[in-house]
Amino acid sequence: MPFAVPRALPLTILAAFVLAGCAEKGAAPLKKDEKPVDVASVVRQKMPASVKDRNAWADALAKTFESQKIAPTEENICSVLAVAQQESMYQSDPAVPGLNKIARKEIDRRAESMHIPVFLVHTALKITSPNGKSYSERLDTVKTEKQLSAIFDDFISMVPMGQKLFGSLNPVHTGGPMQVSIAFAEKHTDGYPWKIDGTVRQEVFSLRGGLWFGTYHLLNYPANYDEPLYRFADFNAGWYASRNAAFQSAVSRASGVKLALDGDLIAYGSSEAGSTELAVRKLSTTLGLSNSDIRRQLEKGDSLAFEKTDLYKKVFALAEQKSGKTLPRAILPGIQLESPKITRNLTTAWFAKRVDDRRARCMGL
């Protein structure tokens, strides 16, 4: 909301007021004793010489930090590079082993769930696509998510069977060097510094787009974390998942109810109370909050404002009173990673620690 500033307001107070407002909306400013660095130069220095397009990475990240007003620090740069290394080994469009089999399995799964004979789907895939090859031939040679996304876009728009199986929803959900969510990118285009000629989905698969939206997801939100580890977990599990998991742990201590520490404070998309909300309701009398108060304040769990609610403060006060010690305000969520691309037993905590190790090594270079 626009606001007017009195002319007589001292400049120092005005500056502090503006900076405070910016901190609420986006990335945190420089920390005390942190020095700004030249983003492009640091990227060139930190990236392996084997990466052929280091200059393109340097230019894209410099523009990204500038346009998003991200503090240009070595830690922030290394945090972005660490995620990109973990997710793609610095490839803007990384190859996915066995992607053709994964894609065909997903198509067959959709067909079976909709009671469509698989042979009909396979027949539809033999139709010639816009590039002159059949969809089946393109699937046989697909190597990257960018290629697969293009196949599905064509299949959905050109073939009735594609529309029946997928509607208007392309089943490729992430892309680019940081494997950022395409749905996230589509909701956060404000301030994007380059002209988008095609769709946001297509832009995510470019180096500049993948880095810009990935950096936005990683760094462009205010959080009171004392180490980057928790931002890496949030990158995987959603903004504030680490803070919310710590809150769930406090709720569990205060109520005696065992909870999954997944960072989801409400059952999103439903008016029904989820497990965390039900556990908090058991404390309603002690907290002096009604069920509607509890719901309304839990709904702020996707923002920094949640930490200012009576619910957040009172739950931690009660849990600390019962445990006799100060409790952490952030913990790694206990979430099992699920994706057709994942063949091992991996968790959000594993991901966050791996990325943090890469960040630390980057800062040691």
List each language-model region with its residue ranges:
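Cell-wall glycan-active module
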Residues: 2-3, 17-365
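Substrate-recognition/specificity elements adjacent to catalytic centers across diverse enzyme folds
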Residues: 14
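Bacterial N-terminal signal peptides that target proteins for export
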Residues: 1-11
